[in-house]
Amino acid sequence: AGKTIPYIRKALNDEIEGIEPSGAFEHFRIAAGESDRDFYGLVSQDSDVYKWMEAAALALQYENQETLAAFNEAADLLKRAQQKNGYLNTYYIIHGLKDKWHYLKESCQLYCAGHLIEAAVSAHQVLGRTDLLVIAEAYADYIDHCFGPEAGKIRGYDVHAEIEPALYRLYEDTGIDRYKRLADFFVEERGRKPYFFSEEPRNTNVGKNLVYELDESDYRHSQSHLPIREQNEAVGYAVQAMYFYTAAADKARLNHDMDLFQNV
């Protein structure tokens, strides 16, 4: 970890010769108004910064001053890039928030948010730090404002069910019940008809920044072909399945739901 974590930071900061620039950290500088470059990576790139921050927080149990300084710098950068309402996704901030919350089948917005929350919870639990937690809670509160079963909210979910286990971790760390309620909604809403991914608004220009294009009708790929209580086999992309089935198990555990537990 003493070598890997600093190396990965340099890679994410486009400092390693011979590696294609990712823009991971640079996108936050652009979003904060500190760089005039254009977005040049993938829409999922924010999550790499958050994953690095979680790894760095865990490594800081063993006191590495170089990593601590880099973590502090990253946390400050996130704070500067975050919108006043809590929203924090560099692709959409850089593009003037056009099509925000569109194309969740591919845009990775809630996926990235989930990894921010997980990094914040780890930093709080391991280091007692609240600075990243404040950023994550502000974003989670805004997501709660935008998504849910209530009138006027988006009845949808991300193709990667990463926000769900992250919200359960945030609930268990803070005791704030609305985070569990929102995670419960996401878990139960996935797979209900009409299929969200078939009806959600498309993004007009995100295509060139995607990892790949998904088949429009392949709902099994994202475990969204049926509601979780009607699913009886593990299907789809293994990474997405891991997130979703973990979230479903969390929901069953935290709500003492034996029927869901048996199904999972």
Listing of model-derived features with the role each one plays in the protein:
Residues 1-264:
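Glycan-recognition and catalytic cores of secretory/periplasmic carbohydrate-active enzymes
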